[in-house]
Amino acid sequence: ATLAPLLNAIGAHDPQALRHALSHAQLRMGLAPFVTDLVAPLTTAVGEAWVQGRFEVFEEHLFTEVITGVLRNAIASLAPLPIPQGPKVLLTTLPQELHSLGLLMVEALLALEGCTCVSLGTQTPVGDVAQAAVAHRADVVALSFSNVHNGTVVHASLRELRAQLSPTTALWVGGSCTALYQKPLEGITPVQHLTGLQPLVAQWRHTH
């Protein structure tokens, strides 16, 4: 699917056309390719258009609302497995991270793999993430970072969270924040591309 008609629908302030086009694309492509090959590049393109002054903030917000609705519907329509498979994944972002779409894309792909997902939405303090991981008996904590963050702050937050989590709880991190991929962080698994989630889930199942 080409991005131009979708970007035009955003610029024309036509949420119905955008929703219709996205819903059709999802049915035609299947959920995983829809997320990795359409939603992810479209989200990047919208962000770039906003930076370049071609989209207003309200247009970016409208896009986020529409795509959130489409992805939530897709996740809700997945048939639950008779016996839930691991891992159980707790999804969130840390404070100051307002971008929720990355999280939702990850949730859609993990749900498709049969994982049990618990999403706390955005901006959860480190201590609360650790508490929630215990309360929900999470096998994995998955965090999303956009490129708004200072690398030093990201590394410090991740070290703090890793120290508070049980050693048996995996910590997966991803998003467009380049600091996640520049050097290895002990006990933390970076997922640079959404396509890396499926092998990671398979690896987790193989070792548990």
Named regions from a protein language model:
Residues A1-A79:
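Long amphipathic alpha-helical segments
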Residues R54-E56, L62-H208:
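C-terminal regulatory/effector modules of DNA-binding transcriptional regulators
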